[in-house]
Amino acid sequence: MTINKNIMKIAAIGFVGILGLSGCNDSFMDKYSETSITEEGFFKSAGDLEIYTNNMYGYVTSDYWDVASDNVIYVEEASIYSKMRGELNPDNASVWGWGSIRNVNFMLARADKAEGDMAEINHYIGLARMFRAKLYYDKVLSYSDVPWYSRDLQTTDTEELFKPQDPRALVVDSIMADLDFAVTHMKDESGARTRWYRSGALAMQARIALSEGCWRKYHSELGLNDADRFFKVAADACKAIMNTGNYELSTGEGAYEALFNSQDLSSNKEMIIFEDYSNELGRKH
């Protein structure tokens, strides 16, 4: 009888143990890697979004020749001819590459998981949307009509992957919506001008709006007769920058040369944002 009681006690303890295991907190069982970044364990805070957007700074570089600036409209003849000959592929295509835009969309699709100060979170969402606007307008300058994607596509999204190009008007309106969000939600300048803040986003908005306005004014074949609204956006953005009182034209002898031939631009009040080159940190042109 005593043996049977002991067996029953052991069985009861085992049953309670099983119940305890089945009642464990799900988060205890679902542990994510603590030594590598995973999608499930990331995008939880504004700090995560900041880390992710740091990688996007390379999407806007200092243009060291006119073909890479908005002073010259670059025609993608080489890429077009390569495509006609069947030679174009993801490894040799340049402007037609979509990896950077997908990286931005990847973050934007998951940014709603972030918790904390919404002003901080929206700053980095606005920053990402500004980068997407710049990346997309580069494609518009080269091809005019391009497919617009607002989310990161998967290999199973065959319909969207093979969809035709969207009209320039739709793409540019989407670009301007990204820039509107950026200038509304990004924080005002704070600290070094080597980081993107609202004034930098306003400058990007002005630059893209002015370029698009000029295209629509002088290219009637587009059938887009609303250049003036883009000129107004550009003018309003420039006025907003001036109204901050943080910037002023560089004047005096050698002022123009100082803009392009100085080792340190941190004290130049004409700089809205600049890249600080440093041999020590390995940041070079």
Across the structure, where does each feature detected by a protein language model lie?
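C-terminal motif of bacterial Sec signal peptides marking the signal peptidase cleavage site
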Residues: 21-23
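Bacterial N-terminal signal peptides that target proteins for export
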Residues: 2-11
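Short coil/turn linking the two alpha-helices of tandem helical-hairpin repeats
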Residues: 140-141, 147, 190, 211-220
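Outer-membrane beta-barrel and related beta-rich outer-membrane complex signature
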Residues: 71-73, 145-149
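Conserved, well-structured interaction surfaces
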Residues: 38, 47-50, 60-62, 77-143, ...
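An aromatic- and glycine-enriched ligand-binding surface/loop that stacks and positions planar moieties
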Residues: 25-78, 180-181, 195-285
